[in-house]
From Swiss-Prot:
Gene transcribed to yield this protein: lepA
Keywords for the protein's UniProt record, in alphabetical order: Cell inner membrane, Cell membrane, GTP-binding, Hydrolase, Membrane, Nucleotide-binding, Protein biosynthesis
Family: Belongs to the TRAFAC class translation factor GTPase superfamily. Classic translation factor GTPase family. LepA subfamily.
Source superkingdom: Bacteria
Record membrane topology: Peripheral membrane protein
Protein name per its UniProtKB record: Elongation factor 4
SUPFAM superfamilies documented for this protein: EF-G C-terminal domain-like, P-loop containing nucleoside triphosphate hydrolases, Translation proteins
Keyword Cell wall biogenesis/degradation: no
């Protein structure tokens, strides 16, 4: 399999916005090169998770090796490395770009360039990839290829004179794409003589073989009889098998520089074979690892609690298993008076959080409650000391701290300019600071804002989509911490603080949020035998309060006429009982109440 010369290898990836037809194009390439037989073909062949097919997004990377006989009658090996298009997974994109020499930039001919595409194109340019613009969906009635070409030139500055028009659905232009890959994407550098280095660009957990690592050999070669060393984790392993993805795994004996393959070596967890790590040989290791390896840091945190306390051990086990295949997921145990035992989890972003939650519920059959998402705050205790906190309920009281700083992001929103006003309104509501506005074309605009991350992680994306009929797209990156007038808003139910409902809000918004929280809880908490006060407080100051009246048993029903003093005695006894109950009683807050309030919190 591997006797092909380096000059005949082409490694490429596909960059596209969600829904611009990347997975369909990948399917079509697999089909046209005869890699996948017609009968085995299914829609979105490379998106292997059910969740990916359902949401129509690519989450985990896949890779496939295709053989293609070009017009010059030479046979080439094309390695397609699939990339996710969503902003949460940008680290997955950056590492797959590192494994390629070229990229197909797929743009929907009826929609134009979107924010995510742009972010990934810049990553590709940083990695010096050859970019081939492809206009997909040219068969649609609304497609305007010329206008979009002009847009690509204006926004990205790419020459589109030899852009390819194609329709992945009907198969138009697929041959041109394959030819362009062969002609325009440079072959890998021939570095077989150098010490072995291979870049891990993906890994997943297989319950039988341990972690399966996808890698690209950068220099030297890997033989299946060797012992390997992972340079970042300093661990060594004996190889069980190495092979290629075609797109099903096929074992081979050896892989050379420039080739893409997989290996299994009984590795226990994905954390040991971190993506971006360098594989080298144990006996003759390389001097230094490949550059650019970063661990992915979580930006969004939330609590995950099982609805049934007995499921806590199952949740622990399933998080451990999920972490085997998702190295960006971080978690630690947490307890809460209201929710019992659970975990505090860190995610790359909101989509990542939703996907982890869905995978836990779907693949491990758990029923979960998720607390409101929060970000990492920097709390300045005094001039010298500061701490970082990801759980709002652990922030120290006002007298123990000087100020709270929150993370800010620089956000770029791309949209048709008729939605300019509504988008500016949305950013203002979310405490955004206006930086700049640029007209890309006559009818498309870029808005640049600096905005607190906490305002973005709740439902900013949904709001932006609904206010612009789905036309806007956005992209953001962290720019640092800033001081703000932030307060910790607590919710007290029967004078006890409900931790999961604690949030950090801006002082100006605190009253409104507190008011709506207590009103919502009043509707949702069932009546008890005693009166329940519900309060929202900042420190020791109550800013909003409601109370749920007690259920009242009619103790006088058996008195008929009777003496007034007898009635008074019974009522007094009832009042005494209620008082004792109020002191002793615990209010069971139903999970629906938490869920509804968390939605409202956003």
């Amino acid at each position: 399999m591997t006797d092909i010369s380096v000059s005949k290898i082409r490694n490429f990836c596909i960059i596209a916005h969600i829904d611009h037809g990347k997975s369909t194009l990948a399917d079509r390439l697999l089909q046209d090169t005869g890699t996948v037989q017609q009968r085995d073909m299914q829609e979105q062949f490379l998106d292997s998770m059910d969740l990916e097919r359902e949401r129509g997004i690519t989450i985990k990377l896949q890779a496939a090796r295709m053989k293609y006989k070009a017009d010059d009658s030479q046979e080439y090996v094309l390695n397609l490395i699939d990339t996710p298009g969503h902003v949460d997974f940008s680290y997955e994109v950056s590492r797959s770009l590192q494994a390629c020499e070229g990229a197909l930039l797929v743009v929907d001919a009826s929609q134009g360039v979107e924010a995510q595409t742009l972010a990934n194109v810049y990553l590709a340019l940083e990695n010096n990839l050859e970019i081939i613009p492809v206009l997909n969906k040219v068969d649609l009635p609304g497609a305007d290829a010329e206008k979009i070409k002009q847009e690509i030139e204006e926004i990205i500055g790419l020459d589109t004179s030899n852009a390819i028009n194609c329709s992945a659905k009907t198969g138009v232009g697929i041959k041109d794409i394959l030819e362009a890959i062969v002609r325009r994407v440079p072959p890998p550098q021939d570095e077989i003589k150098l010490p072995t280095k291979a870049l891990i660009f993906d890994s997943y957990y297989d319950p039988y073989r341990g972690v399966i690592v996808y890698f690209r050999v950068i220099s030297g070669s890997l033989n299946k009889r060797e012992k390997i060393l992972l340079m970042a984790s300093k661990k060594n392993y004996e190889l069980d098998e190495i092979g290629i993805m075609a797109p099903d795994q096929q074992q081979v004996d050896e892989l050379h520089a420039g080739e893409v393959g997989y290996l299994a070596a009984s590795i226990k967890s994905v954390a040991d074979a971190r993506v971006g790590d360098t594989i080298t040989l144990l006996n003759s290791p390389a001097n230094d690892p490949l550059p650019g390896y970063k661990t992915a840091n979580p930006m969004v945190f939330c609590g995950l609690f099982p609805t049934d306390a007995d499921q806590f051990p199952d949740l622990r086990v399933s998080l451990e298993k999920l972490q085997l295949s998702d190295a960006a997921l971080k978690y630690e145990p947490e307890t809460s008076s209201a929710m019992g035992f659970g975990f505090r989890c860190g995610f790359l972003g909101l989509l990542h959080m939703e996907i982890v939650q869905e995978r836990l519920e779907r693949e491990y059959d758990l029923d979960l409650i998720v607390t409101a998402p929060s970000v990492i705050y920097k709390v300045n205790l005094n001039q010298q000391e500061h701490i970082f906190i990801d759980n709002p309920s652990t922030i120290p009281d006002p007298q123990l701290r000087e100020s709270i700083e929150e993370p800010y992001v620089k956000m770029e929103i791309y949209a048709p300019n008729e939605f300019n006003g509504t988008l500016m309104g949305l950013c203002q509501e979310r405490r955004g600071v206006f930086i700049d506005m640029k007209y890309i074309t006559t009818d498309r605009v870029t808005l640049i804002y600096e905005i607190p991350l906490a305002e973005v992680v709740t439902d900013f994306f949904d709001q932006m989509k609904s206010r612009t009929q789905g036309y806007a797209s956005m992209e953001y990156h962290l720019i640092g911490y800033r001081k703000n007038d932030l307060v910790r808003l607590d919710v007290l139910i029967n004078s006890e603080r409900a931790d999961p409902l604690t949030s950090i809000v801006h002082k100006d918004k605190a009253y409104g949020i507190g008011r709506s929280l207590v009103e919502k809880l009043k509707e949702l908490i069932p009546k008890q035998q005693f009166k329940i006060p519900i309060q929202a407080s900042i420190g020791s100051r109550i800013i909003a309060s409601e109370s749920i009246s007690a259920l009242r048993k009619d103790v006088l029903s058996k008195c008929y006429g009777g003496d007034i003093s007898r009635k008074k005695k019974l009522l007094k006894k009832q009042a005494k009982g209620k008082k004792r109950m109020k002191a002793m009683g615990k209010v069971e807050v139903p999970q629906e109440a938490f869920m509804a309030v968390l939605k409202l919190n956003q």
